[in-house]
Amino acid sequence: ARQHKGRAMNKIANHMPTAELQALDAAHHMHPFTDNSALAKKGARIMKSAKGVWLTDTEGHRIIDGMAGLWCVNIGYGRKELAAAAAAQMEELSYYNTFFQTSHIPAIALAAKIAEVAPGDLNHVFFAGSGSEANDTNIRMVRRYWDIKGQPEKRILIARTNGYHGSTMGGGSLGGMSGIHAHGGKIAGIVHIGEPNWWEQGGDMTPEDFGLLRARELETMILQLGVENVAAFIGEPVQGAGGVIIPPSTYWPEIQRIVDKYGILLIADEVITGFGRTGNWFGSETFGIKPHIMTIAKGLSSGYQPIGGSIVCDEVAEVMGSAGDFNHGYTYSGHPVAAAVALENIRILQEEHIVEHVRDVAHPYLWAKWQALTDHPLVGEAKLVGLMGSIALTPNKATRAKFASDTGTVGYRCRERCFANDLIMRHVGDRMIISPPLVITPDEIDILIARATKSLDECYAGLKADGMMKSA
């Protein structure tokens, strides 16, 4: 009877034992950004279900998700309304394309809703399946824009070292991450300037002076290349995958001044910062940026369906529409099911005042506790905007020194302690980062901070025991 009950429970749970799942995963599933041979030996942690800010794995551990999946589950997991929207749309119109002078109701309604919530004159949307695809769209769009205006030589896009704009050939080229460039190279016509990372690179300068210095690299690069050759500048309001690098207050106003002075297009990559993450609907509002094009994805559907897009200002859209076909698009541009889910997601964000919750409740509550982490012997800096934050790990707070070990060694150890303590935090080099679902409550923030502190304590004890609290 006990054996029968065990089999029945396993059937209800709807999965094989974890070890068997791990073996199947290792045999057939190639994971992104992963050493798959190392993972095969270790075995993946396998998630089974989720609700709100909580994940449950196949071993029954209840894990608080400090990263909202990959920065995307803004309204939290398990919202039945989004499942219902997907099911209803699948029954009514499961798929149709938006090529060949054809449209459908979900794409029309979503484009109009995005125009409603987007700032300024960002009133037009070109849909894609992801943020990476949307940034590939942006490369072609800005080059086509200048071509139509009779300046086809304006083809170069300027981006930033350690920026992230996806991992397609186009998006990966825009991003300034050497590890991505090493696997397949870059496409032509993209150059990079420095990032506004004061903690690691600011030396003895004030953050404000360093912000100006980094921003003015854009002007230097424009003049070096020739303004007649430069199409656009792209940047994330806050570098996400680069380590939640919140720029000094002087940085974005100076960038805006420079793009305005030289008349180049400004692309704000809001894949992470969009849809409430910074306490406003868009990070551009938080930092006073006025982009011509805005990249969106992730929080657009809270990750419930893959969808992205480029929100385009009136002037760029008018030019793009004045010269015949734009020979670009994707099978899943404006996919009706994804669009219906995104529309329902935005309804929930609006009607449940989730953006206001971030600004007025969650951020102020987390801010005080996040800053207090700088009292920990391992933490040199704690930064937070809205509900995305980072802490810098250092062996010497006074000098902001790096560890003698290879960059990322300490961060990885800390991340593993977080995982062991049922907290998902990510490490970027030796920075620990968070980006929890926007619906996180003060009580859940207390749990997140308690588990983060325990993990830092354990990491610090291990580093001391192994003689690793040494400066480079």
What residue ranges belong to the model's regions?
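Conserved N-terminal phosphate-binding loop of PLP-dependent enzymes in the Aspartate aminotransferase
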Residues: 10-472
